[in-house]
Design a protein with these regions (language model features):
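Short beta-strand scaffold segments in enzyme catalytic cores
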Residues: 106-108, 154-158, 210-214
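Active-site environment of divalent metal-dependent phosphoester hydrolases
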Residues: 10-15, 39-41, 63-68, 120-122, ...
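Acidic, His/Gly-rich catalytic cores of divalent-metal-dependent hydrolytic chemistry
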Residues: 161-255
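Active-site neighborhood of divalent metal-dependent phosphoester bond hydrolases
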Residues: 47-48, 54-142
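Beta-strand-turn-beta hairpins that frame and shape the catalytic cleft
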Residues: 1-4, 107-114, 187-194
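Active-site neighborhood of phospho(di)ester-bond hydrolases with catalytic His/Asp-centered motifs
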Residues: 6-7, 31-36, 57-62, 115, ...
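N-terminal active-site segment of His-dependent metallophosphoesterases
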Residues: 1-56
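Hydrophobic, aromatic-enriched interface-forming segments
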Residues: 138-168
Length: 255
C-alpha cells in the first residue's frame, strides 16, 4: 500500500490540490496529513474541506491548535505567527471545530510513527533540526520509519546499526527543482529514519512544495518535490486581503 504523507498546507488549497493530483498520478492509495492545515495562508476553510475529503489520517499541528484557541501561551502574547489563526477561529463552523478538536499530534499507522513536530513531547511542537534532537527522537520511538513536518524543510535523518546519526538528504535535496522530481532513499539493513516531509503550501525554506511517498512493506521511501508558483500564491494572498510575509516579498522583488 503506497502512502502519500503531507504536511503544512497552511490554508493554501491550490497547492494542496496540486499535490493530491500528483500523488494520485503516482499511484498513492492512502493519504496522511501531518497537521497545520490552517495558518499563514489565504483560505483555511477550503483547505480544511479538502483535507477532510481526501485524507485517511490527519494529525493536529500547532496552527490548528491555535485556530481552536488551545495555544494560549503563545496566542496571548500576540505572536504574529498566529494572527490568521485567531481570525480563522471566528470563521470555523461548529462541525469543523469539532473535527479539529478530535485530532491528535501523534499516531502510528502501518508500523510508521507520524507526528507534526517531534516525538518526545508532541504537544510542545519542538523542531527536529539538530543531531542531538534527532537522537532524542529516535530514542522516544521504536518504529523504523518516523515521519514529521513542522520545519517546512524536507530532510532525512538516519540512525545506523552502529548508532551513528547522519543526514543523507543534505546533498540530494539541495537544489530547487525546475520540474517535478522524486528523490528515493533505500533503507539500509538495521537502520532507522526520521523523514521530514517538508511543506505543501508554505515552503519558506525549501522554495518548492514537497511530500513523502512510502510503501511500508518495501525497502524504499521518497521525497517528492514540485515547483511552487510564488507569483500566483502572492496574488491569491492579496486578493483575499492577507498581508504578504517578509520572506515572500524578498523572494519576489530581490534580484
Amino acid at each position: 500500500m503506497k502512502y502519500a504523507i503531507m504536511s503544512d498546507v497552511h490554508a493554501n488549497p491550490v497547492a494542496l490540490e496540486t499535490a493530491l493530483a500528483d500523488a494520485r498520478a503516482l499511484g498513492c492509495e492512502k493519504f496522511a496529513m501531518l497537521g497545520d492545515v490552517t495558518g499563514y495562508g489565504y483560505d483555511p476553510k477550503r483547505a480544511l474541506s479538502l483535507v477532510r475529503e481526501n485524507f485517511d489520517i490527519v494529525l493536529m499541528g500547532n496552527h490548528d491548535s491555535a485556530c481552536l484557541g488551545l495555544e494560549q501561551r503563545q496566542c496571548d502574547l500576540n505572536n504574529p505567527n498566529y494572527d490568521l489563526d485567531r481570525k480563522c477561529r471566528g470563521e470555523l463552523s461548529d462541525d469543523d471545530a469539532k473535527w479539529l478538536r478530535g485530532l491528535r499530534p501523534l499516531r502510528t499507522v502501518a508500523g510508521m510513527a507520524l507526528a507534526h513536530g517531534d516525538f518526545t513531547e508532541p504537544k510542545e511542537w519542538y523542531y527536529i533540526n539538530k543531531p542531538a534532537v534527532a537522537a532524542a527522537n529516535f530514542g522516544a520511538r521504536k518504529e523504523k520509519l518516523l515521519f514529521c513536518g513542522h520545519t517546512h524543510r524536507a530532510e532525512v535523518w538516519s540512525l545506523s546499526r552502529e548508532k551513528i546519526i547522519s543526514r543523507p538528504s543534505d546533498r540530494r535535496l539541495k537544489d530547487v527543482p525546475n520540474a517535478p522530481e522524486t528523490i528515493e532513499f533505500k533503507r539500509e539493513k538495521g537502520a532507522r529514519y526520521i523523514v521530514n516531509v517538508g511543506s505543501v503550501g508554505y515552503p519558506r525554506h525549501d522554495l518548492c512544495m514537497s511530500y513523502a511517498i512510502c510503501d511500508p512493506s518495501s525497502g524504499v521511501f521518497a521525497i517528492r518535490r514540485l515547483p511552487f508558483d510564488f507569483g500566483s500564491y502572492a496574488m491569491s494572498m492579496v486578493s483575499h486581503g492577507v498581508d504578504l510575509p517578509a520572506w515572500l516579498l524578498f523572494l519576489l522583488f530581490s534580484d
